[in-house]
Amino acid sequence: MYNIQKVRDDFPILSRTVYDRPLVYLDNAATTQKPLCVLDAMRDEYLNVNANVHRGVHYLSQQATDLHEAARETVRRFINAPKTEEIIFTRGTTESINLVVSSFCEEFMGEGDEVIVSVMEHHSNIVPWQLQAAKRGIALKVIPIDDSGNLLMDEYEKLFSDRTKIVSVAHVSNTLGTVNPVKDIVRIAHEHGVPVMVDGAQSTPHFKVDVQDLDCDFFAFSGHTIYGPTGVGVLYGKEEWLDRLPPYQGGGEMIESVSFERTVFERLPFKFEAGTPDYVATHGLATALNYVSALGMDNIAAHERELTAYCMEQMQTIPGIRLFGTTPDKDAVVSFLVGDIHHLDMGTLLDRLGIAVRTGHHCAQPVMDRLGVQGVVRASFALYNTKEEIDALVSGVKRVAMMF
C-alpha cells in the first residue's frame, strides 16, 4: 500500500480551504484532481517543445510528435491493447462513444436493427443511440437491474434477436458504483456474433483494466477522470472492427491523398484523428497513467474498496438514510438521500462545511426513474481520499439532517 499523506502532497489543490474549512473533495466521478507531475509535464511541453505534430521536419515538431506517439504507447500498455494502431485519441469518453455509434450505425445498422444498453447508462451512452434511432429507425433494448443495482443477466440474454447488432454498456455505474460483469456480457454477446463497446470512464481510474482479458471490441475512457487533463480521451477498438468503420470526421491528418474526385484515408489510427490533436493533453494523460501505474492499480483498488466499504458502513448510522447501489461488488461511489431532504439542499449545506459532493441525476436519468427518485447525493472517491474525510462527510450529513 502507498503512503496516503505522500500521495496527497502530490495534489496541491487538496491543501486549500473552502469557507475557511479544509477541502474534502468527494466529487471524483465528475473529475479528479491533478498531481503536480501532470501540471509540470504540460507546462514544460508548452514552454519548451510546443509545435504541431506529424506535420513538420523541424526539431520541435519531431520532438512533440515523439511525445504524442509515446503517449499512445503508454495508453496501449496501460489497458494491455495488442497494438498502438488500435488506440485512438479523442476529446473524451463522450466523443469516443459518439465515434463508434456514428460510424458503426453508418456501416452496419438500418431500420429495425437493435442495440442493447443497460438502464444504468450515462446519457453519453444513450443519447447518441437515440439520435441514430431518429435518423435510421434503430431500436434500443435495455438491460434491467434489481433493487441492489445489479444487472439482471438472465433478462440480458433474452434481449438478443437476429436484429441485434451491438451491445454498449458501462463497466462501472457512475451513479451506483456497480461493477458490471463485463466479461460475461462480452461472452454472451459474442456467442450471438455481436460486438461489445464498454464505457470505461468509471472503471479505468479505479482498478486494472485489460481489454484483451475483457475481450471487448471497443473500450472508451477519459483523461480527466484518471488524474489527467480535460479534453482528451481514448477509444480502443479491435483492428478488425476499426478497419471496417468509416471515418467519423474529415479534415487534415486523416488522409493519405485528396483530389476533387476522391480521398484516400490514412491507416489506423490516424483515419479517426482529423485535425490537430491536443498533443499537450495526450502528454499529460500519459504522465497521469505513469503516475497511477507507479502507485500500483491493485494498491489503488484496495484502498478505494476499503474507503467505499467504510463509507457504506458509517452511512448506515445516519437516521433516515437511503443508500442506492448496495451490491457488494461496487467501487468508489456512495449515493444517498436522507429523509425528505432535497439532494440540492444537502449538497449545498455540505459545501458550506467544505465538503464537495455531486447532486442531481448525474447524467443518468433513466436509472433515477428506476430508483423512483429525481436525484441523489453522490460521494465518489479517489486514490487520495482518506477515512478521516469519510468521517467528515458522515458528520456533515448528520449535522445537515439536524437542521430539517
What do these predicted ranges mean?
Residues M1-F404:
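Pyridoxal 5′-phosphate
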